[in-house]
Amino acid sequence: MASLRHRVRAIALQILFELDATDHPPDQVVGRRLEEEQLPPEGERFLRRLVFGAWEHAAHLDRIIEEAAPNWPVSQMPGVDKAILRIALFEALIDKEEKTPLKAIINEAVELAKQYGSDNSSRFVNGVLGTVVSRYRERSKG
C-alpha cells in the first residue's frame, strides 16, 4: 500500500493539473478533494502546503524548469509533467517545513511520472530534477 505522503503527492498532482487546466478556485478544489479523500490531519496539512505552495510559486518554479529544459517551454509541456515538477521543486527548493531528502523527492516524482505520465515522463522528470539539483549544488559551492 502506498504511503500517506505518496498518496498526498498524487492528490496534489491531480489538484494542480485541474487548477492549471481550469479557472476553478484553488480553495474550492482543495476543499472538495479533502472531503473526498478523508485524509488524517498530517496528510491534510501536507496536501495544503504542497498545493498552495506549488501554485503560489508556479511562475518562479516554471522559470527554473525552463532553465533546466530549454527545449521544452512550460506552456507546451504535458500538464502532468509540469505539475509533478512544480511539486518536487517546491519541496526541494522552497518548502522550509519539511526536511524531505532530495533523493526521496526525486524518487517520488519519478514514481508519480511512471504512474500518471506518458511513456517518456519519468525520464524527462528525472532529467529535469537532476539538472536542477546539480546546478543548485554548483551555485551553493560558488
UniProtKB/Swiss-Prot annotation:
Record's keyword annotation contains Glycoprotein: no
Single GO cellular component term: cytosol
InterPro entries: NusB-like_sf, NusB_fam, NusB_RsmB_TIM44
Residues that span the membrane, as ranges: none
Pfam family, one: NusB
Classification via SUPFAM superfamilies: NusB-like
Name of the protein: Transcription antitermination protein NusB
Native species: Roseiflexus castenholzii (strain DSM 13941 / HLO8)
